Design a protein with these regions (language model features):
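Membrane-embedded transmembrane alpha-helical bundles that form the catalytic cores
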Residues: 1-471
Length: 472
């Protein structure tokens, strides 16, 4: 089920909120757990056993880790069970056939692919990392093991952040899970509705609209557009315009989903961590990764980079640790070589900055922003290079070897205003304007209501457009 659909906006969300608010205090987590399971099973009920297994493995492992507190060997054994169980399911569904295909291509073997896997369980990369963080934190004694399986299940399967984040650590919400009274307030409800509305607007008014420009240029086979060009016919300037549009689409799509999730969390009385902080205003690649998908970066920093030694064991070890993290970041995003190359690309950029470039970037004013945006956009070209209708080699040939073809002028005339608005929305300017407007209650309510009505009208009048990060 997608947030930006009629069935979610007009049926699932209002019914769930009504049941949740009306439920007795001690049953709220039960209502949240059951409604979230309905949400998860709506599209692919066959993956219900996967979710149940993941919950049980980590729930039981957490209890056993805590129970055998004075027996280190048993604690490590149950942590290993949680890690192997969680990562094993992720590997089976997401990476097994990729490994088999790669082995066949590289080694000349003839391993048969696993039949019946089909589509990837929605959000498996996100909720697997959540359960891993829980089991590791219990092992580290950072949190107490959750003894109520319903409360633990509600944490794992909580629908606002289940499918595409933000990645929420158990310790971020453990107190809120157990505060049955006064969990939410009218102020929280208003803040949540505001965030949800802004996120919905990002998705349907910006991401989907600017994404149409990219679709018109590459000309995917199932595109409803009759004006698409096709990558082979596009000129180099037009391809650059298209990849810039894709960069904007990806940001608004993913940050919009995260904002909607954070907003719904507030409606339910939970404070989820922020996931984006205007990444396209960054003045270095290092800063970009502090602003983009912050919960994923934070997860790798806490559970991989620091345990490997972080910055504490010399420069060579620091670079190696960075290599491991960026490689895993690429692999996390997808079972394909372009994602691995994308991760290694960022490793090289981050290593160069760490070795010598960062001090020079910190002295600059304008050129560091240009440098960062250029490299990020090139990275997104690598990222999208495996999508349907996109030839990785042809895309980079068009980007870096000047070629003629269809001019971008037609598309600039049609999408120029949208491009300008989208670029402005990548900066804190809109937030500053909103901070001025929201001081007046009437203006604040009118603005949110108008934005919600317009966004909802677009949802009603458009076809279903899934979030891009559902693929990961």
């Amino acid at each position: 089920m997608v947030f930006s659909t009629i069935i979610f906006l007009f049926r699932f969300l209002p019914i769930t909120l009504a049941l949740y608010y009306l439920a007795p205090a001690k049953l709220k987590n039960t209502v949240l757990f059951l409604c979230s399971l309905v949400f998860y099973c709506w599209g692919e009920v066959r993956f219900f056993p996967v979710m149940v297994a993941l919950i049980l493995i980590n729930y039981i492992s957490g209890l056993c880790i805590e129970h055998f507190d004075q027996k280190p060997a048993l604690r490590r054994t149950f942590l290993l069970i949680a890690l192997i169980g969680s990562l094993g399911m992720l590997f089976y569904f997401k990476y097994a056939n990729f490994v088999l295909r790669s082995a066949n291509a590289l080694l000349g073997t003839a391993f048969a692919e696993i039949q019946g896997i089909g589509t990837l369980p929605l959000g498996i990369s996100f909720y697997t990392f959540q359960t891993l963080s829980y089991s590791i934190d219990v092992y580290r004694r950072d949190v107490k093991a959750e003894r109520n399986i319903i409360d633990f299940g509600a944490y794992v399967v909580m629908f606002p952040q289940l499918i595409a984040g933000p990645i929420v650590k158990y310790r971020d919400v453990s107190n809120q899970l157990h505060v049955y009274r006064h969990r939410y307030s009218l102020q929280q409800l208003e803040e949540g509705m505001t965030l949800f509305t802004f996120g919905l607007a990002k998705k349907v008014l910006l991401a989907d609209a600017i994404g149409a420009l990219w679709t018109d240029i590459i000309g995917v086979a199932d595109s409803p557009s009759t004006t698409f060009v096709g990558l082979a016919n596009a000129s180099t300037p037009l391809v650059w315009l298209g990849i810039i549009a894709y960069s904007l689409q990806l940001y608004f799509d993913f940050s919009g989903y995260s904002m909607m999730g954070i907003g719904m969390g507030k409606m339910l009385g939970f404070d989820f961590p922020a996931n984006f902080n205007y990444p396209y205003i960054s003045a270095s690649i290092t800063e970009f990764w502090r602003r983009w998908h912050m919960t994923l970066s934070g997860w790798f920093r806490e559970y991989v980079y620091i345990p490997l030694g972080g910055n504490r064991k010399g420069l060579k070890r620091q670079i190696f640790n960075l290599f491991v993290v960026e490689l895993l970041t690429g692999i996390w995003h997808g079972a394909n070589w372009n994602f691995i190359c994308w991760g290694l690309y960022y490793f090289v950029l981050l290593a160069v900055e760490k070795l010598f470039l960062l001090p020079h970037l910190q002295k600059g004013k304008v050129w560091p922003h240009i440098y960062t945006l250029f490299l990020v956009v090139v990275g997104w070209a690598m990222f999208v290079g495996n999508d349907t209708g996109v030839s990785f080699g042809l895309l980079f040939q068009k980007l870096f070897i000047p070629s003629g073809g269809v001019s971008p002028l037609y598309f600039l005339r049609n999408y120029g205003v949208l491009l300008v608005v989208s670029i402005l929305c990548c900066t804190p300017l809109i937030e500053k304007i909103w901070n001025l407007l929201k001081k007046n209650a009437v203006t604040r309510c009118a603005a949110i209501l108008a934005l919600l009505v317009v966004s909802t009208a677009y949802v009603v009048g458009s076809t279903n457009s899934p979030f891009l990060y559902f693929n990961f």
